A protein has these predicted regions:
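Conserved beta-strand hairpin/beta-sheet module of binuclear metal-dependent hydrolase folds
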Residues: 1-41, 134-146
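Extracellular/periplasmic catalytic domains that process cell-envelope and extracellular macromolecules
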Residues: 5-6, 15, 72-74, 182
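Active-site neighborhood of phospho(di)ester-bond hydrolases with catalytic His/Asp-centered motifs
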Residues: 22-25, 50-60, 80-82, 124-127, ...
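Active-site environment of divalent metal-dependent phosphoester hydrolases
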Residues: 29-30, 57-64, 88, 129-133, ...
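Active-site metal-binding motif and surrounding structural segment of the metallo-beta-lactamase
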Residues: 32-80
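Metallo-beta-lactamase
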Residues: 41-44, 75-124, 129, 169-185
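Short amphipathic alpha-helical segments
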Residues: 64-67, 93, 154-156
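Cap/insert and terminal regions of metallo-dependent hydrolase folds
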Residues: 130, 139-195
């Protein structure tokens, strides 16, 4: 395949009430991330992003928060991160520390169950990382890295990817969130799920 094949999405954009909400920021330009190119295709500049909600601090989710020179990409965005994720060892990693420092003036810390701007609900999805978060907006549930292999993990939520830091908690989160989505008729989207 000379052009390759997309294998995952590491960011989602929702346009609502005149606001642009970004869920995660992908790999970033330094790692050949495509977020800025994709945003421009729908007429969105980084300055037009109002909110960034971070599911967790892995590089394929926060790498796009900074330019290759280490500056803010989303200069006007309010950034929301989980208290548990920020206080975990991941929150002390070099990439996360740089991102948190650059966005300190626009940084907001949330707890699970909090309602964030534009009526986005932060949902406990721990296991993949200590503060891994799913976000619900209306009937859409963005589950981050809750699953890495949907065809396998949907019928067998007890199966874990090597990337899950606490496999027991990851399994419990998967089972709980899958049931929650089913009971509430939610559309589930994730960073490593087919679309």
């Amino acid at each position: 395949m000379p052009d390759g094949m997309p294998s995952s999405i590491s960011a989602y954009l929702i346009k609502t009430n005149g606001k642009n909400i970004l869920f995660d920021a992908g790999l970033g330009q330094k790692a050949n991330g495509q977020l800025l190119n994709e945003l421009s295709k729908v007429g969105i500049t980084p300055e037009q992003v109002d909110y960034v909600y971070i599911t967790h601090f892995h590089g394929d989710h926060i790498g796009g928060m900074l330019t290759p020179e280490g500056e803010k990409v989303f200069t006007k965005a309010e950034v929301y991160v989980s208290r548990l994720e920020k206080e975990s060892d991941l929150g002390k990693g070099e990439q996360a520390v740089k991102m948190l420092e650059k966005y300190a003036d626009k940084l907001h810390i949330f707890n699970f169950g909090d309602r964030l701007p534009e009526d986005v609900l932060a949902i406990d999805a721990v296991g993949h990382t200590p503060g891994h978060t799913a976000f619900q907006k209306g009937n859409l549930l963005i589950v981050g890295d809750l699953m890495h292999a949907m065809a396998l993990q949907l019928p067998h939520p007890e199966y874990c990817a090597n990337f899950d830091g606490d496999k027991e908690k990851a399994v419990a989160s998967r089972k709980r969130i899958l049931e929650y989505a089913k009971q509430n008729g939610l559309i589930m989207s994730g960073m490593h799920l087919p679309y």
